[in-house]
Every structure is written in C-alpha cells, then in structure tokens.
C-alpha cells in the first residue's frame, strides 16, 4: 500500500526546498490546525527546483504518470496537522525536509495511512474535508492504521485515495525548526 525511500535526494536539494518554504512570502492557505500551504501545479511552480524534483520523480518512478498539483506545508512547531482525508489523485508523494535534529517527539511528525478508502458515493467535500464524517466512518469500519515515522529526506509514495493524516507535529522552538513537507500529486499511468 505504500513505498518508503530514505535519502533519495542530495542534501543540497533538501536544504534548498526547506529554505524556500521557511523564507518565502507565499502563503496560499492558512489552516486552523496549525500550518499554511505553498501551492503549485503543472503550469506554475514558485521555485524551479520543484519542477526538477517532479521530473526526477517521474523518471525514477514512471508509474506515477502525469503530475497534477502539489504544495508545501509549513507547520507550527506544535500542531495537530492535517486531519484525516483522502485526495482525488492516484498517487501522493510526500517528501519531508526538516532535519531530524529539529524533532522534539519522535513518536510524532510522521504520517498515518488508514487501510480504507471512502465510499464511492461520497463527494470530494465529504472525503476531503468533512472531519466529523470521516472520523465516524473510520471508527464504524474499525479501520486499521499504519504510522510512517518522520525522517528528513524520507520519500513516501501511497495511493492518495486511502484516508491519511499527519501524526501530529512536535518540533523544537524557533521558525527554522518548523516541520516542512512537500506533497506531489500524480495521476498515475
């Protein structure tokens, strides 16, 4: 159901992605769960390196197919993070870029993937944003979860149609210690 690869990118690439996310003035969306997004898609990327990363992923993993859209999330140092949801794209590729030395609680900061997709009858709003409905469904179905632990320069590929969420965020104080992840959504081949 998922694939994990560590240290797939050069440290310089990880550092540049992190530096950009932490210092840019771009703030596309602010979320009450303690993070903001920097959005991009196939027609607009705010940093040329992002396009290079997308091309590198497509070359290394041809099954990913066409790039759809993506974002970087920059989290508060302590935050609940992204709530359970599913996405419409076939593949979700997550890349974590904050150094491990910035982590306070090693049991947090990763990603939880559930073993269930939403019912086919659910709308995008229901499976992507209806937190209460999703939590009830996960409880009702007794879905099992897998926790992927956080690690800097860790790449995680999974079917984004399965419910998933952030495993809370707990990083050291200071703006340069904030958890940053890049998400790349692909349509599949």
Give the positions of each predicted feature.
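Catalytic core of non-heme Fe(II) oxygenases with the double-stranded beta-helix
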Residues: 65-189
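Non-heme Fe(II)/2-oxoglutarate
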Residues: 2-65, 71-81
């Amino acid at each position: 159901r998922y694939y994990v690869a560590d240290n797939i990118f050069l440290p310089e690439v990880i550092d540049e992605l992190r530096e950009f996310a932490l210092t840019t003035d771009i703030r596309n969306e602010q979320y009450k769960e303690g993070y903001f997004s920097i959005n991009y898609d196939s027609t607009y990327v705010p940093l040329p390196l992002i396009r290079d990363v997308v091309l590198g992923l497509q070359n290394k993993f041809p099954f990913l197919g066409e790039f759809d859209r993506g974002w970087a999330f920059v989290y508060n140092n302590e935050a609940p993070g992204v709530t359970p949801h599913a996405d419409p794209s076939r593949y979700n590729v997550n890349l974590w870029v904050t150094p491990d030395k910035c982590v306070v609680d090693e049991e947090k900061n990763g990603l939880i993937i559930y073993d269930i997709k939403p019912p086919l009858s659910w709308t995008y709003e229901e499976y992507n944003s209806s937190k209460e409905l999703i939590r009830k469904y996960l409880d009702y179905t007794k879905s099992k979860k897998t926790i992927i632990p956080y690690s800097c320069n860790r790449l995680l590929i999974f079917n984004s149609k399965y419910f998933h969420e952030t495993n809370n965020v707990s990083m050291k104080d200071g703006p340069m210690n904030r958890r940053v992840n890049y998400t790349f959504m692909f349509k599949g081949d």
